[in-house]
Amino acid sequence: MIRVAINGYGRIGRSILRALYESGKRQQIQIVAINELAKPEAIIHLTQYDTTHGRFQHKVKLVDNHMLIGDDAIKILHEPDAAKLPWREMDIDIVYEATGVILDRQSCEAHIHAGAKQVLISHPSSADVDGTIVYGVNHDLLRAEHTVVSNASCTTNCIVPVIDVLDKHFGVKSGAITTIHSAMNDQQVIDAYHDDLRRTRAAGQSIIPVDTKLARGIERILPHMKDKFEAISVRVPTINVTAIDLSVTLAKTVDIASVNQVLELAANGRFNGILGYTDEPLVSCDFNHDPRSSIVDGTQTRVSAGQLVKLLLWCDNEWGFANRMLDTSLAMIAAKQS
């Protein structure tokens, strides 16, 4: 049984916990502790009730500063200094680092010094970590000596499996990406101050361009794609589910049918459970709570002049990513034991 702690219990932290109990992986992973500065009553309430994902299927109680879920008792901590967390006493195997602010190796090593054996960051990180993993594409690169690992981003997990499939079958020469991302909690409900002037504006009233390092994230997973991609991102007034508009120039001549065929085969084969394919007339809310990293919308595939291909990809940027955190942590332990 893997003993884990969650540091930072926001959207991703809570999704990880709920996904654990829904995914069937509870027999492999035990959440021992949650470190979050919010009041315990709010932690319990937001675990039980969620606007995006609905009510949690298990009853959650607060008893003696523990979250009780069935027979599981999860210690709730409120320690702002990661170096002071009781990971050694709790025998923590992996910390899910989900604060969104501890992103480099030096900061994450506070968890290691506190006694945790490994750290998995729920965010793109600095380049000095042991590895950045997109589960299903490069998790086989994990090694026993890896202690600090990044799970990349939700959009990197969405797009990289698709690029990998296209490159292996047709060769990818270059690409351009537009991420159409749901609003996030770094935006404002009504106009308010922010360092990014666009993010001073009300999230529910505008399509808001934001910076993205998605193209660099692709390079980290697929180094041979260096300088082949550029990306932009906009936030839209929805609370969950992201779409990615992917345009790629291929080395081989293709048509819509051949592109969709290889992606559907990959979804049913090598990337089963990670990549999906649909030809139904669906909209973004239909992918809410979908555990897969990416779903190709085959109805929107377009081909121009035989080599320029446009695809539409969907992902639940919370739930899909939370499920990959579970998968990557299991792969980290497997690598450590091999």
UniProtKB/Swiss-Prot annotation:
Q: Which residues form the active site?
A: 154
Claim: Ubl conjugation is one of the keywords in the record: no
Q: What is its EC number?
A: 1.2.1.72
Q: Please name the pathway.
A: Cofactor biosynthesis; pyridoxine 5'-phosphate biosynthesis; pyridoxine 5'-phosphate from D-erythrose 4-phosphate: step 1/5
Name a GO molecular-function annotation: NADP binding
> One cellular component GO annotation, for this chain's record?
cytoplasm
Entry superkingdom = Bacteria
Any idea which UniProt keywords this protein has? Cytoplasm, NAD, Oxidoreductase, Pyridoxine biosynthesis
Q: Which Pfam families match?
A: Gp_dh_C, Gp_dh_N
GO biological process annotations for this chain's record? glucose metabolic process; pyridoxal phosphate biosynthetic process; pyridoxine biosynthetic process
Identify this protein by name. Answer: D-erythrose-4-phosphate dehydrogenase
The protein's organism comes out as Shewanella sp. (strain W3-18-1)
Q: What is the lineage of its organism?
A: Bacteria, Pseudomonadati, Pseudomonadota, Gammaproteobacteria, Alteromonadales
